[in-house]
Amino acid sequence: MVGQQYSSAPLRTVKEVQFGLFSPEEVRAISVAKIRFPETMDETQTRAKIGGLNDPRLGSIDRNLKCQTCQEGMNECPGHFGHIDLAKPVFHVGFIAKIKKVCECVCMHCGKLLLDEHNELMRQALAIKDSKKRFAAIWTLCKTKMVCETDVPSEDDPTQLVSRGGCGNTQPTIRKDGLKLVGSWKKDRATGDADEPELRVLSTEEILNIFKHISVKDFTSLGFNEVFSRPEWMILTCLPVPPPPVRPSISFNESQRGEDDLTFKLADILKANISLETLEHNGAPHHAIEEAESLLQFHVATYMDNDIAGQPQALQKSGRPVKSIRARLKGKEGRIRGNLMGKRVDFSARTVISGDPNLELDQVGVPKSIAKTLTYPEVVTPYNIDRLTQLVRNGPNEHPGAKYVIRDSGDRIDLRYSKRAGDIQLQYGWKVERHIMDNDPVLFNRQPSLHKMSMMAHRVKVIPYSTFRLNLSVTSPYNADFDGDEMNLHVPQSEETRAELSQLCAVPLQIVSPQSNKPCMGIVQDTLCGIRKLTLRDTFIELDQVLNMLYWVPDWDGVIPTPAIIKPKPLWSGKQILSVAIPNGIHLQRFDEGTTLLSPKDNGMLIIDGQIIFGVVEKKTVGSSNGGLIHVVTREKGPQVCAKLFGNIQKVVNFWLLHNGFSTGIGDTIADGPTMREITETIAEAKKKVLDVTKEAQANLLTAKHGMTLRESFEDNVVRFLNEARDKAGRLAEVNLKDLNNVKQMVMAGSKGSFINIAQMSACVGQQSVEGKRIAFGFVDRTLPHFSKDDYSPESKGFVENSYLRGLTPQEFFFHAMGGREGLIDTAVKTAETGYIQRRLVKALEDIMVHYDNTTRNSLGNVIQFIYGEDGMDAAHIEKQSLDTIGGSDAAFEKRYRVDLLNTDHTLDPSLLESGSEILGDLKLQVLLDEEYKQLVKDRKFLREVFVDGEANWPLPVNIRRIIQNAQQTFHIDHTKPSDLTIKDIVLGVKDLQENLLVLRGKNEIIQNAQRDAVTLFCCLLRSRLATRRVLQEYRLTKQAFDWVLSNIEAQFLRSVVHPGEMVGVLAAQSIGEPATQMTLNTFHFAGVASKKVTSGVPRLKEILNVAKNMKTPSLTVYLEPGHAADQEQAKLIRSAIEHTTLKSVTIASEIYYDPDPRSTVIPEDEEIIQLHFSLLDEEAEQSFDQQSPWLLRLELDRAAMNDKDLTMGQVGERIKQTFKNDLFVIWSEDNDEKLIIRCRVVRPKSLDAETEAEEDHMLKKIENTMLENITLRGVENIERVVMMKYDRKVPSPTGEYVKEPEWVLETDGVNLSEVMTVPGIDPTRIYTNSFIDIMEVLGIEAGRAALYKEVYNVIASDGSYVNYRHMALLVDVMTTQGGLTSVTRHGFNRSNTGALMRCSFEETVEILFEAGASAELDDCRGVSENVILGQMAPIGTGAFDVMIDEESLVKYMPEQKITEIEDGQDGGVTPYSNESGLVNADLDVKDELMFSPLVDSGSNDAMAGGFTAYGGADYGEATSPFGAYGEAPTSPGFGVSSPGFSPTSPTYSPTSPAYSPTSPSYSPTSPSYSPTSPSYSPTSPSYSPTSPSYSPTSPSYSPTSPSYSPTSPSYSPTSPSYSPTSPSYSPTSPSYSPTSPSYSPTSPSYSPTSPSYSPTSPAYSPTSPSYSPTSPSYSPTSPSYSPTSPSYSPTSPNYSPTSPSYSPTSPGYSPGSPAYSPKQDEQKHNENENSR
């Protein structure tokens, strides 16, 4: 550390962490001082004592003293270790258990393993690779081995013995007793007293000695390591002493110091050690030494771990337990989680938030005081030096200013104190720490950060006052409100971080959330309320207000729409004005129930080309809904436009609402008189019903529903009546409130409130419930002392019949408070529960990432999914779409899809096609069409197998319907004209498209299968939407439109593929954890509905994640075999066959009598039974009379239960007989007797003595018990109760459409899957249980995975949330990927073999680190946690790849360029269309068209329309053209703002500009200087213009007037295949489409991203081009000296040297026009002449 110089070079990163144990030698080698004294200070109490605990060699913690070892001050010296030599070895407390296990594995005399390869099981154990598992296996085998064998039987011949080198001694059984190990030896029988084993404490020396004798081979088998962790190192002989900086003392004044707990503990250890040494030295008695030794052991143990079970805690003088080393590391506040995984950070701010509707969606208002405090270090460059100088002049107190200047030497100048701040001359490369300013990207966050939308990047807007301001719509993802919430802001400190924030985290990019593939932001609050009022049919606005409103639209084009009403005065409808804020080209339609095209209620929604046609805009349209306006705009126009849309809508609507007004008050809750009367009647009626039911129940006339007790049935009825009354009253109130009612307006707009709020405010608050039941009796038999006992009336049990408006009575208020209190407690409990669940999920999935081979893997590289989500799509790019082929009848299907050119029924109407009449009867075409139709039928069959119930709404990429709509709009499809498409175009186009939809690229089988699976569903959708008949008949697309649709689908599909580096694990964990937080803890939705009770909500989620063996409510769902599903009788039969019925469940009473005479009875009721029975006696029974016992067991059965279970007395009696065979004599009454009685007597064997007879009644009691508990009368074990439920199942009818069929389903309590599956009459293929553990055990891991998924899905769906499939699938894949069920707990995923650092950051921190040390683990630091701990960039996201640098090429091609040259180059390369472009020499009088030839108007030549559109080239970029979108433009692939090389000035440099078709013979990349990046492309060369390689104004052969170069010359004719850039039909807006060049039709095979001639990185590369040779060393499109054909211009040629004077772009010898420079010129002229012919 001495004199270290400042360096800006980055430090090396940690590649791996090796764990191990310290050996005593190593401790001594590290140590700088031997510590001998427990004192810290010397006698003077001023200096640290030499050899004491604060020895000056250990490091200084006094800022006045230097460290004696490294001579550094307190700030620089990290501290140095010392050591204590212990008088006796002691156990390391963390390893006592392991030491015990090792002792049990090796011989306690010779140190040899007790078993070796001679033992078969041991051989298997030794073969285990994982050292921890191997150790566990060996220990299991060895711990029972009680002798160290000298020889063992040989394998070949068991009679012969083979020596194994053991010592033959017996082994002790070892017990852990506190901190000691106690051995007990069983003595040999030979030596006598076998009863008394020898007991003694195993001393540490003894164990240390044995461990030293274990051979390397043996301890390696036990999982230790020769170099890093030998077993003897688990026993401490030399203790390292941490340096004082780790245990600093605090000084109160000169003399008094307070020492740290560790120092205190170390002093104890030293004292104990010294006293032990003294005792040994003085030869003290054995027990004294033993005592001193155990004291030392205690101190060393509590120094490391002060929470040892069964050990007293070491206390401070104050009585507070000492904080041990272990306590410093573990837990949330500990070192790992508290200081390494998460730390407090600089450059952050926190304050209260408030709303501001005038900010843009992605802005954040930052108070000026914060903006002046937070800084960003900006590097001084030529471009910003003036600005930064001004900031430095402004200084730290004026915004915008700067706080520090950092020189390139690393020195900081603090501008607060700098005298000469004004005249600091900034130098390039210095840094200025400037204040944050407008539009800086910052990270904004609100805790708890439950999902990735809780941290987003905003743009700064510096504003006055002291709170953060944010747009209202961005509050929902943060879950923020303005009632005092605070939020945090973090300022990025490097350009890379800024780039990541603005390109990855920016708010607009998060609008559509991957959690449920829908937007997570929408219009909220007053804007939402106002937007509904604004778009009502009767909202009209006058001219003055319209003008004001239009001014509020930020990008209004200045055109006032035509008013909707002209006379008597012009009026504009609200819909019109709102439409101005919606971008053009947006289509949206939604039909609510009962919407026609002109719905009287104005419900539904239709937006065409950004104009609202009908429908009131409310939450369904502009809320965060799937397929709403926000979603569509993001998908169609890109995130930036969508973010703008939020602002536009808010500004317009808020302005209107401000002037229109909206307020709500108590009057809005009042319903009119007649309604109130009706409400009162409704409630009275319900109370009367309840009274009737109560009377019925008291008179015992109520029948219990199946599976419920009588009381449950009664409660169920009461609650049902009361809830119905409340809902009915609420509906009355709601219907009565007018549409003008303000509360109702808020509910209808969706901005606040719901139906239930109206009902409770105006009508009736309703039944209060606690734990899902009515209020229970808390006092004796009553709820409150104000009621009489046993009062079950609604008032007494918590029914509140008043509304909030009328006010509650005291009793009602009390019950209401009870219900409310429960809600609060529930919320508090839930927050803790779900927080822990979320943490476990995140830690279990944190390292799962999509890799560059599209697999989803964890940090070990284990494959979790071969392709993410099984389709490789990014969840944010997916939308719910319906697969059309699945529904409808067969006839309708055929009508919609079948085309038969040979048959008049299914032929196409000839008027649809221009070639309509020619194709009828065309057999070749018919073959294509039949193939298409067969495939569609196959799809239909396949989809019906997958989506059994015919519901085929599934989230898929690329909204095809919208692309078709856009095409119809863009190409002005006329539904009356025939199309110029041919059937072949359609069928083959769709076929080619399917082949181009590549998610995975590769030839091997696994990849091919995964690729096929990934696109299967999407291809089904594609084929159904683009079937020939639909394209021609429904959509009426033209050839141009159809091609556009295809290329668009492909581009959007490829854009939807998930990006490698995406951390999908955390995404999945958050997507499941976040809805869990919104879940109610215990869901009582099914309060007493007659069905099985199912755990749901958070408790069920906990069960699933813990893989709980005993669930609260295990249950089976049993379906009947096909054919009998609707048969109720059959269902009853099966119910009784599987419901488990014990004798106990049908018995009312059981009694024991002394009834000595078997032939008669003392019980009068039973005489009939006996007489009846004895009239039918057989011989055997006669004989048994004498042996029958006088004690009688008499059972009375329950007739109702017997009937319910469908049992007869005979069956029960025979079952008892069967169980006890001849030991019991049983008789029973008839089935129709008054009472059902069974009488049993024990039959005694003849040889019974009197003594036994006396105990017979006891024996009978035991028999009675056995009978009632164990006798199963019928059914399957564990199936406690079976409920029959009737469900409707959707099945395809014979005609093909889906119809509902009722079926009976049995729901059970209890599970016994394997048994129930064998019961005849059920459908074993459909049986299901919610216990996925059983499913896995019976049906295997794949079935288990499916069941686990279904359970997770049900928990989340039960709450009404929706989470995309891939997140839950990833979770269940992780849980099942090991082949068993891995729970999301410390016993599950945290036992896997991921890195120790990663595991210790979850739970059991210290134990995991001990284990890692003992087994010498190596952590390769590929996980997230490891890199967070080490403070490194983790290999995820933008850090997931490496960059390879070709160093040779670097040296070769580094041009020496001045800064100005770079500037000019940039200017030209990226600035299209500008005369001032740096690449033009102003002296040249060249026409614009010639300069940038491709810019000729595309629409001019209609017959040859080159653009996709009829718009001229000048329209490029306007909103009307389909190419005007942002980076997400759904147009040609790669064309958009973000496309790197597209610039009209560099046609050869654009992957999307095919007009330079390399296949055209006259084009050859011979122009040495045609590349914007080439240095020779410089304005300093006057003789060069990009249109011709050999252009020189002085050359007579090239002048616009010369006949050989005239746009009309045949060589440039637009129809010629040479397709020159000057040809009028080439337009930059038609990047991939040119009707005349056969080689460039997007559907032609040569235009395919995979075809070799198309590669975006090498625009001029084409194997067919004659002048291209792959062997040319200098060919590289980016190389500054790129020209494959010129031999004299090859960087490898000997005379090439950038520094040589002959190579200078300005030298006259270097002129592209000079003949000497173009060796290929003649050849080229020759080519041109050839072409012109």
From Swiss-Prot:
Mg(2+) 2 binds at residues 481, 483. Zn(2+) 2 binds at residues 107, 110, 148, 167. It is an enzyme of class 2 (transferase). Residues 1538-1719 have a biased composition (Low complexity). It comes from the Eukaryota. PROSITE patterns: RNA_POL_II_REPEAT. It catalyses: RNA(n) + a ribonucleoside 5'-triphosphate = RNA(n+1) + diphosphate. The keyword Phosphoprotein applies. There is a cross-link at residues 695, 1246, 1350 (Glycyl lysine isopeptide (Lys-Gly) (interchain with G-Cter in ubiquitin)). Residues 1720-1733 have a biased composition (Basic and acidic residues). Mg(2+) 1 binds at residues 481, 483, 485. Residues 1549-1716 are annotated as: C-terminal domain (CTD). Component of the RNA polymerase II (Pol II) complex consisting of 12 subunits. Interacts with DEF1; the interaction is direct and serves to bridge RPB1 to the Elongin complex in a DNA-damaged dependent manner. Interacts with the Elongin subunit ELA1. Interacts with the Elongin subunit ELC1. Interacts with ASK10. Interacts with ESS1. Interacts with RTT103. Interacts with SHE2. DNA-dependent RNA polymerase catalyzes the transcription of DNA into RNA using the four ribonucleoside triphosphates as substrates. Largest and catalytic component of RNA polymerase II which synthesizes mRNA precursors and many functional non-coding RNAs. Forms the polymerase active center together with the second largest subunit. Pol II is the central component of the basal RNA polymerase II transcription machinery. During a transcription cycle, Pol II, general transcription factors and the Mediator complex assemble as the preinitiation complex (PIC) at the promoter. The C-terminal domain (CTD) serves as a platform for assembly of factors that regulate transcription initiation, elongation, termination and mRNA processing. This is DNA-directed RNA polymerase II subunit RPB1. It comes from Saccharomyces cerevisiae (strain ATCC 204508 / S288c). The lineage of its organism: Eukaryota, Fungi, Dikarya, Ascomycota, Saccharomycotina. The gene is RPO21.
